[in-house]
From Swiss-Prot:
Residues 16-41, 57-68 form a propeptide. The keyword Protease does not apply. This is Riparin-1.6. Expressed by the skin glands. Residues 1-15 form the signal peptide. The lineage of its organism: Eukaryota, Metazoa, Chordata, Craniata, Vertebrata.
């Protein structure tokens, strides 16, 4: 039962995000959202850009240990 409620809420939230973005696209002059606008509206953690989310920096840890 909890899973069904969770999925329903998730669907409502995603539908609202789609409606908001569609409404903003209608009001924009060129009918296109630039990537800069998307980054401002939906900020992502910096690890997304460096592609290191959830990964340890193996090279730096090997260097710190003296290569042992």
């Amino acid at each position: 039962m909890k899973i069904i409620v969770f999925l329903a809420v998730l669907m409502l939230v995603s539908a609202q995000v789609c409606l908001v973005s569609a409404a903003e696209m209608e009001h924009s002059s060129d009918n296109e959202l630039s990537s800069r606008d998307l980054v401002k509206r939906f900020p992502l953690p910096s690890c997304v850009y460096t592609r290191t989310c959830g990964k340890r920096d193996i090279e730096s840890s090997e260097g710190a240990n003296g290569g042992e």
